[in-house]
Amino acid sequence: LHTALRSKNNDSTIISEEVKNTLSKMKTISDEINNGARVGHSGKKIENVVNIGIGGSHLGPEMVTEALSFYAQSIKPYFISNIDPDYTENILKSLNPDTTIFIIVSKTFTTIETLENAKKVRKWFVKNVNEESIKNHFIAVSNNTEDPKEFGIESKNILSIPEWVGGRFSLWGSVGLIISICI
C-alpha cells in the first residue's frame, strides 16, 4: 500500500482520499511557511525547521534534504535524532525560537527517544518563549492524534501517518513534511 503515497492516480478509494488529504495539508503548511503566511508567535517569518524523530522518521527525510539541498528554499533544516543531551543542546543553541518550527515525527507518539528529545525541545521553547506559543511552533506527524494534543499541539498541526505505511517508505507521506518545507 505504500505505493499509494507516490501514486498520481486520482481514483476515489478511501486510501487515495486519505493520501490526497494528507498531501494537501502538507502543501498548505509548506506554502504558508515559505510565503510567510504562517509565522512564529512574534510575527517573524520562519527561518528554521527541526525534525525530531528516529529511524524512518528521520533517515529518509534527512537524506533527501541533504541530497536535494541545491534546490533548497530559504528555510534551513535541522534534525534531532540522537538522545545525547549535548547533541540536542548544540542544535538549540544555534536556533532562535521565534523563527523556528519543530516537527515531532513518531508513528505512535510513544517512541521513547523521540519523545525525550521533544520534551527537551519543548522545555527549551517554553523557557525562551511561553507555553501558549507551542501552537504556533510545533507540528506532530503521527497516527496517534490524542497524545500530540496533550503535548500542546493543535489539531490543525497534526498530520496523520496511516497504519499501513512502513518506516522506510514514510518519507513519501507526512513524514516528509520537512522535505516539502525545505526543498
Regions found by a protein language model. Give the residues of each.
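Extended, charge-enriched "interface" segments that sit outside catalytic cores
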Residues: 1-42
